[in-house]
Amino acid sequence: MILLNNSERLLALFKSLARSIPESLKVYGSLFHINHGNPFNMEVLVDSWPEYQMVIIRPQKQEMTDDMDSYTNVYRVFSKDPQKSQEVLKNSEIINWKQKLQIQGFQESLGEGIRAAAFSNSVKVEHSRALLFVTEDILKLYATNKSKLGSWAETGHPDDELESETPNFKYAQLNVSYSGLVNDNWKLGMNKRSLRYIKRCLGALPAACMLGPEGVPVSWVTMDPSCEIGMGYSVEKYRRRGNGTRLIMRCMKYLCQKNIPFYGSVLEENQGVIRKTSALGFLEASCQWHQWNCYPQNLVPL
């Protein structure tokens, strides 16, 4: 694999990946953040250049120092020929199979190569999937170097119409001081490693909340290092009031204004969330969201 670290090549890859959306969207979103400051210190690998068949985005080596930190040890993969991915994936120089890790992508056909590579390295694999939701704009996306990541801290004040609809609620940036609150209410979190991950996300990426009458967040949403919107939550006391919907609408408006790509995923059984997501203008993509959680035999969870 070739390490791409030239800004011109990274931009060329970004433009090329746009032609493979939605299948390439997980890698495309990660590359967006790499091209705009690289706050998570990620690196890009391709099998060849300028013609390529496979792209892997992973944290730089100095980031992956905790063998148990699957929030950090994440590999995002896109392949033009997923059936031939096994040889690349089983290479321990590409994937550190001695760690607890995640492999993410929007191609179910990657699974066969991942499972075979994991088996050859004595690693257990657990696969999860969800529906992928995107906007019409991102399906029409054409890459441009005019895209600029704005400062989330400079997002400005809530729209007048939003304030008039919710006089006791205020739209605000979700800053690092609320990391504990987010972690305590994230089903995939609630531990010290997830707290560290959330702090990094809130410190570097777009995140917003609705402050309630008491001045604390009652609804919030964040973004991850691949531009996926997630960790959305509304405090039970303030649910079914439309605050979450208004919050997402405001976030979508901001992200569109700043040319920041975004998308979301919803478990197929969450029909209520699917209906709300569709009502916001999201479309179900032709491919699905996939994640492979990988555990070395000595680190397999009980």
From Swiss-Prot:
Lineage, highest ranks first: Eukaryota, Metazoa, Chordata, Craniata, Vertebrata
Catalytic class of the enzyme: transferase
Cited InterPro entries: Acyl_CoA_acyltransferase, Glycine_N-acyltransferase, Glycine_N-acyltransferase_C, Glycine_N-acyltransferase_N
Recorded family membership: Belongs to the glycine N-acyltransferase family.
Keywords assigned by UniProt, alphabetized: Acyltransferase, Transferase
Disulfide bond sites: none
Record-given protein name: Putative glycine N-acyltransferase-like protein 1B
Pfam families hit by this protein: Gly_acyl_tr_C (PF08444), Gly_acyl_tr_N (PF06021)
Organism: Homo sapiens
A GO BP entry: glutamine metabolic process
Family annotation (PANTHER family): GLYCINE N-ACYLTRANSFERASE-LIKE PROTEIN 1B-RELATED, L-COA N-ACYLTRANSFERASE-RELATED
Documented EC number(s): 2.3.1.68
Catalytic activity, as annotated: an acyl-CoA + L-glutamine = an N(2)-acyl-L-glutamine + CoA + H(+)
Gene: GLYATL1B
GO annotation, cellular component aspect: mitochondrion
